[in-house]
Amino acid sequence: MIKCVCLVEEKNHQLLLVQVRHRDKYYFPGGKIDEGESLVEALQRELKEELRLELAKGELEFIGTIVGEAYPQPNMLTELNGFKVNRAIDWSKVETDHEITDMKWFDINDSENIAPAVNTWIKEFIND
């Protein structure tokens, strides 16, 4: 199982998702946890790498965990440990790193363009 951390930014039934180079589906900003890292440390590192965003530990709040289908690895599962940010961020001014080819808001019902584990998150935590 691939253990990951992710930033879940949701408003008005839309999620902020990113697309990584050479991948079709969009998923939460974040990534794999390196050996010896806490969940928060891993998310801080990933957000700095992907979005050039530096957040203090106190600005991140754990909101839940799901296990879903890994993307793009077939026949693998991923554990997503989700966090939200406890301060306002102007997402239109956030610059992505070279590995991120796109960042945009998706309606939670746009399952065709969203990675499987993100759709699992939506079913578990967002859809009522």
Feature map (PLM): residue ranges:
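Short secondary-structure boundary/capping segments
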Residues: 7-8, 18, 73-75, 92-97
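Short aromatic/basic micro-patch
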Residues: 27, 77, 105
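Conserved N-terminal beta-strand and adjoining loop/helix that marks the start
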Residues: 1-15
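NUDIX/MutT-family hydrolases
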Residues: 82-84, 93-125
